[in-house]
Design a protein with these regions (language model features):
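Hydrophobic faces of well-ordered beta-strands that scaffold small-molecule active sites
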Residues: 14-18, 57-60, 84-88, 110-112, ...
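Active-site gating/metal-coordination segments in enzymes
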Residues: 66-146, 153, 194-203
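Conserved, mostly hydrophobic/aromatic
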Residues: 17, 49, 72, 102, ...
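Divalent metal-dependent hydrolysis catalytic cores, especially in the metallo-beta-lactamase
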Residues: 31-64, 83-89, 107-115, 137-139
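Catalytic pocket-lining loop regions of alpha/beta-barrel enzymes
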Residues: 122-229, 237
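Short, electropositive alpha-helical surface patch
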Residues: 67-84, 215-223, 247-252
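Mid-to-C-terminal alpha-helical segments outside catalytic/metal-binding sites
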Residues: 1-12, 38-56, 224-226, 240-280
């Protein structure tokens, strides 16, 4: 049973990063995948999210599905398009009809995964960015800190916003003065980038993953209008598996100001993903 965090997230808070896996008889995994996740259904997600007060959600296409976005689109439909959006994986074989279909299905961005692979190819980044610009989408990047530092000049020139996963992959143990973190801050300073304050994958110490506090606070202070937060549920590949309520507790402790929390959990996601209201 999940214990709700204290204090709770504000109304209309958005979980901007999680995955759905299965059912595998309907949505089989890609043969080129690098791991085999256990099933994680829409019902499982809601059983986790509702007690935490997470009322909006962004389903991120996982690498194990390649460019077959059916499981992600199905999840958006089942959650309801009034409260759910998606980030898809595509390559240059996608045609304009398919892009419009994805947009109608709630997709608001595409993901480039340089860690788990099996996603949007890096060499197609520029061309795909130009194609999705007219849709108002963004590109989401999952990379380690070293690769992100190398890519930063290219990302800053793209014609679409760029969402950086998991604190930019910069290890918390490096400290906020490290060259990788400073490169991330410079990228945020361009006003073109967004950052997900999902912190445990950047931890250098492991459980309870609380060494990322300085990174989260620095980013929340540097780019308050371009920060969002996500659970990364069901935490694929993690051992031990984080308690999702504990992760939300951490975030609320690290960002104690109610106005800042509301901005990161409600206002910023509404602006980026196109939700229509920011208060109840």
């Amino acid at each position: 049973m999940i214990t709700p965090p204290h204090p709770k997230a504000p109304p209309l808070s958005c979980d901007c990063h999680f995955h759905i896996f299965g059912p595998y008889d309907r949505f089989p995994l890609d043969p080129g995948r690098r791991y085999d996740p256990p099933p994680a259904s829409v019902e499982d997600y809601l059983a986790m999210a509702e007690p935490l007060g997470l009322q909006r959600m962004v389903v991120v296409q996982a690498s194990v599905y390649g460019t077959d976005n059916r499981v992600t689109l199905d999840a958006v439909e089942r959650f309801g398009r009034d409260r759910a959006r998606a980030v898809a994986v595509i390559d240059d074989r996608v045609d304009d009809v398919a892009l419009r279909r994805l947009d109608a299905g709630g997709v608001r961005g595409i993901r480039l995964n340089l860690v788990s692979g099996n996603g949007t190819p890096e060499h197609q980044l520029d061309a795909l960015a130009r194609r999705i610009a007219s849709l108002g989408w963004h590109i989401q990047i999952y990379a380690d800190g070293d690769r992100l530092e190398q890519l930063a000049p290219c990302l800053a020139r793209l014609p679409v916003p760029v969402m950086i996963d998991h604190l930019g992959g910069v290890r918390a143990g490096h400290g906020i003065q490290h060259a990788q973190f400073q490169a991330l801050l410079r990228l945020m300073d361009t006003g073109r980038a967004w950052i997900k304050l999902s912190s445990y994958r950047a931890s250098s110490t492991g459980h309870p993953w609380d060494d990322s506090a300085a990174n989260v606070r620095a980013l929340a202070a540097a780019a308050p209008e371009h920060c969002v937060w996500g659970t990364d549920w069901p935490h694929p590949g993690m051992d031990p598996i984080p308690g999702t309520g504990n992760l939300l507790d951490q975030f609320l402790a690290w960002v104690p100001d109610p106005a800042a929390r509301h901005r990161i959990l409600v206002e910023n996601p509404a602006r980026l993903y196109g939700f229509t209201t920011t208060d109840q």
